[in-house]
């Protein structure tokens, strides 16, 4: 059966997210669409109050974020999410360094074709997949 784990993730402030450990197959790069299956070292993550989901690799002070992004993605991987309970950090794709997102179309374009840039409480924009 599937092994479901739920975590509350935070993007530096009290940003909550649920995370499901996904099937190890699918996407050729990190930060792919969870619909296609996250990689074995990623978690499928939703951020509370933010539409969509994303595959998030773990990161820490000593483990930088992987830089292999899906084709067409210009957003920068950042160690921006944190599980409030375990304090484990996760990488996400940063598409706006400030809020409000001034040019939504340009911000969305950084996320590739199936994802868009969403404002999160930490004062940044992160890419999530809408499908």
Kindly label every feature range from the protein language model.
Residues 3-131:
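Secreted, cysteine-rich disulfide-bonded mini-domains of extracellular proteins
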């Amino acid at each position: 059966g599937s092994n479901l784990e739920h975590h509350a993730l935070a993007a530096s402030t009290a940003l909550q997210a649920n995370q499901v450990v996904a099937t190890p197959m699918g996407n050729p790069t990190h930060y792919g669409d969870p619909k296609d299956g996250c990689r074995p070292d990623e978690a499928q993550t939703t951020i509370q109050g933010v539409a969509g989901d994303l595959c998030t690799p773990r990161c820490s002070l000593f483990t930088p974020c992987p830089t292999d992004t899906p084709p067409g993605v210009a957003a920068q991987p950042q160690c921006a999410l944190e599980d409030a309970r375990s304090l484990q950090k996760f990488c996400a794709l940063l598409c706006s360094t400030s809020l409000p997102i001034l040019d939504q179309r340009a911000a969305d374009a950084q996320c590739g074709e199936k994802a868009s840039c969403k404002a999160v409480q930490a004062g940044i924009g992160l890419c999530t997949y809408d499908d």
